[in-house]
């Protein structure tokens, strides 16, 4: 049902779930900063603290901002489709740039310390996430922002784009959990099992990551919370149906 101004109102519970997701996401970032500040000495580029740039940037970029980019089409329900696309794409660009800083930080730190690269499951999953994220963005840019792709191609690719977007986000959350556990085992060793305060805080951070991922995924999978088709999108959809199925208004 549309409002008198022609705008489709958001479903009743959607704004509350979106607000809850933002509260969780900001808390994840804050707790990450608190963990690194209180127990790891903070962050810096030209010192032993350079490694700490990595988890902070990855959490902000590939978890929080990527999650927000996926929610754009649920939050902005009545704005022009192209405007929403651009915001969706720009949030992904920002997430990519921040994640790239985090990736450079950890490789540079390893080089300075003589530590081997890409031997752990966390690092393998991290590289996979980064490559998939970049590929997803580039393909999405070609299909949905540049005018070259036809409506039929966009319609056929859209389900894959939606699926891989959610899959990459969940893989990002899982990779962050692997990295968190790896860092705790390296730093605490056997003290981890003694309920050290750092370990407890990091475990809370892990639960917050899971909660943020779960709430974002729930919002994305609610079919009744999808962005409604605008008038021009409905017209294009009808034209595509006419071309592919052979029906026309006169045959109804």
Curated annotation (Swiss-Prot):
EC number: 7.2.1.-
Domain Cytochrome b561, residue spans: 20-221
Keyword Heme: yes
Residue ranges annotated as Cytoplasmic topological domain: 1-17, 74-85, 147-159, 221-252
Transmembrane intervals: 18-38, 53-73, 86-106, 126-146, 160-180, 200-220
Cofactor: record remark: Binds 2 heme b groups non-covalently.
Subcellular location, record wording: Cytoplasmic vesicle, Secretory vesicle, Chromaffin granule membrane
Sequence positions bearing Phosphoserine: 248, 250
Topology versus the membrane: Multi-pass membrane protein
Gene Ontology cellular component terms for the protein in this record: chromaffin granule membrane; lysosomal membrane
Domain of life: Eukaryota
MF terms (GO), sorted A to Z: metal ion binding; oxidoreductase activity; transmembrane monodehydroascorbate reductase activity
Binding positions (heme b 1): 54, 117-120, 122, 182
Record-listed heme b 2 binding positions: 74, 81, 88, 161, 226
Record PTM N-acetylmethionine, positions in chain: 1
InterPro entries: CYB561/CYBRD1-like, Cyt_b561/ferric_Rdtase_TM
Described purpose of this protein according to its UniProt entry: Transmembrane reductase that uses ascorbate as an electron donor in the cytoplasm and transfers electrons across membranes to reduce monodehydro-L-ascorbate radical in the lumen of secretory vesicles. It is therefore involved the regeneration and homeostasis within secretory vesicles of ascorbate which in turn provides reducing equivalents needed to support the activity of intravesicular enzymes.
PANTHER family to which the protein is assigned, alphabetical: CYTOCHROME B561-RELATED, TRANSMEMBRANE ASCORBATE-DEPENDENT REDUCTASE CYB561
Record protein name field: Transmembrane ascorbate-dependent reductase CYB561
Organism the protein comes from: Sus scrofa (Pig)
């Amino acid at each position: 049902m549309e409002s008198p101004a022609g705008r489709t109102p958001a479903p009743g519970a959607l704004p509350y779930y979106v607000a809850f997701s933002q509260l969780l996401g900001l808390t994840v970032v804050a707790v990450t900063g608190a963990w690194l500040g209180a127990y790891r000495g903070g962050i810096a580029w030209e010192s032993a603290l350079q490694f700490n740039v990595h988890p902070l940037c990855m959490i902000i970029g590939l978890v929080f901002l990527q999650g927000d980019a996926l929610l754009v089409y649920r939050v902005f329900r009545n704005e022009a489709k192209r405007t929403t696309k651009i915001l969706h794409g720009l949030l992904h660009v920002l997430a990519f740039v921040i994640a790239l800083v985090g990736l450079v930080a950890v490789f540079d730190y390893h080089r300075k310390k003589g530590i081997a690269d890409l031997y752990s499951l966390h690092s393998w999953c991290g590289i996979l996430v980064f490559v998939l994220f970049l590929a997803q963005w580039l393909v999405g840019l070609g299909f949905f922002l540049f005018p070259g792709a036809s409506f039929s191609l966009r319609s056929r690719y859209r389900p894959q784009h939606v699926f891989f977007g959610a899959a990459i986000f969940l893989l990002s959350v899982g990779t962050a959990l692997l990295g968190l556990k790896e860092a705790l085992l390296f730093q605490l060793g056997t003290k981890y099992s003694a309920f050290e305060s750092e370990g407890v805080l990091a475990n809370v951070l892990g639960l917050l990551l899971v909660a943020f991922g779960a709430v974002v995924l729930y919002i994305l999978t609610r079919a009744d919370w999808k962005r409604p088709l605008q008038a021009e999108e409905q017209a294009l959809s009808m034209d595509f149906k006419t071309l592919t199925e052979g029906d026309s208004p006169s045959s109804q």
